[in-house]
């Protein structure tokens, strides 16, 4: 078995300074693996084809090299920064790309920053020993320039932009998010079953509904859903061609929203605990400064349970990260197209969690929303507010 690093470790990466960091991967059982970086060397034995080395805190620096070797094989990664690493977690509004925000024309041409890096955890929806859906190629860490920035999280970019200009420290952003996801997608079965109401609403009801579903039935439902989405996209394109001056909020009011949710099934990325395994577990041992958690829109239908659900997410992630990592909770903004009038309830739950759970901090985004658009295009203001919260917490 070849020596490998976990996918998140590539040239151009950013490692967290000032705390222990984990380097991990796979290889041949019983071989010795040695790593060297910033003058530090550490060795471990590969057990059951897996290895992990924890290094003492590294100092802020640039242009470092990581060497990983078994003696028979060597991996060398270059152009590594040591700075602060932030996880961008949740659903579509933290995933929302820079190229789609309303400030793209103003800021794109002046965005180049070799000390700002971005890693997107591949959005694997389903995998087993035979298949991976979709078969996404790992892009590795990207340096911020006027091309790569298009696919950065817009909120993440603006947070990093303000940090870089105010604090002048290398910044790494790790996107571990996917649009349309409930908090229940991001925790494991043990945590989903800790609370009986959460278990009933999020876990039992889902899997009971697909208990007798065949793979052929699921594939048929997926095909039907994809056709509905295609027809909707055609309507949107025609509307934008006819009314180019109208904004997205007006479009959503007139045309309606993207067909949602998709069909349930074992390959549905919205299944309980699904993305916990296919995305979060791949990077949970990577050391970082804080988690930016912007999520909740999908859970407004069960807003009365969100207080418990969000607590479970935080507990589960901290357990897996083996750290009391701070959570910066981005509170949902105003939104008028809430048929159940549940958004205020969920906002209250977010605030309550930040009052009760240690090292959880709220960022208020009221007046950043749009009347009928669940994906407001002003991400610069939200990124700036997160920056101010983080600055007062970690840098003042």
For each of these PLM feature ranges, what is it?
Residues 1-396:
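Cell-envelope and extracellular/periplasmic
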């Amino acid at each position: 078995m070849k020596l490998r690093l976990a996918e998140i470790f590539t040239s151009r990466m950013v490692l967290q300074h000032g705390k222990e960091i984990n380097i991990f991967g796979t290889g041949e059982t019983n071989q010795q693996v040695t790593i060297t970086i910033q003058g530090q060397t550490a060795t471990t034995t590969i057990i059951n084809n897996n290895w992990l080395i924890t290094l003492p805190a590294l100092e802020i620096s640039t242009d470092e090299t990581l060497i990983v070797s078994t003696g028979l094989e060597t991996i060398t990664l270059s152009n590594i920064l040591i700075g602060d690493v932030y996880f961008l977690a949740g659903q579509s509004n933290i995933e929302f790309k820079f190229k789609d925000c309303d400030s793209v024309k103003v800021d794109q041409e002046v965005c180049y920053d070799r000390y700002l890096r971005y890693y997107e955890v591949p959005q694997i929806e389903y995998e087993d020993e035979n298949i991976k859906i979709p078969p996404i190629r790992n892009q590795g860490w990207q340096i911020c320039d006027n091309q790569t920035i298009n696919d950065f999280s817009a909120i993440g970019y603006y947070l990093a932009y303000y940090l870089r200009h105010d604090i002048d420290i290398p910044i790494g952003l790790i996107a571990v998010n996917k649009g349309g996801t409930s908090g229940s997608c991001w925790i494991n079965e043990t945590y989903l079953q800790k609370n009986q109401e959460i278990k009933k609403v999020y876990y039992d009801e889902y899997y009971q509904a697909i208990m007798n579903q065949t793979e052929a039935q699921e594939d048929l439902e997926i095909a039907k859903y994809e056709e509905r989405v295609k027809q909707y996209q055609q309507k949107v394109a025609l509307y934008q061609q006819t009314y180019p001056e109208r904004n997205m909020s007006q479009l959503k009011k007139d045309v309606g929203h993207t067909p949602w949710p998709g069909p349930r099934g074992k390959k549905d990325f919205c299944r309980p605990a699904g993305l916990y395994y296919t995305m979060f577990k791949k990077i949970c041992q990577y050391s970082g400064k804080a988690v930016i958690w912007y999520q909740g829109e999908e859970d407004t239908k069960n807003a009365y349970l969100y207080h418990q659900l969000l607590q479970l997410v935080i507990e589960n992630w901290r357990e897996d990260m083996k750290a009391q990592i701070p959570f910066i909770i981005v509170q949902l903004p105003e939104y008028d197209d809430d048929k159940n009038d549940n958004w205020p309830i969920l906002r209250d739950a977010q605030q309550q969690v930040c009052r009760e759970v240690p090292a959880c901090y709220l960022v208020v985004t009221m007046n950043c929303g749009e009347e009928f658009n669940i994906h407001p295009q002003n991400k610069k203001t939200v990124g700036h507010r997160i920056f101010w919260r983080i600055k007062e917490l970690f840098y003042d």
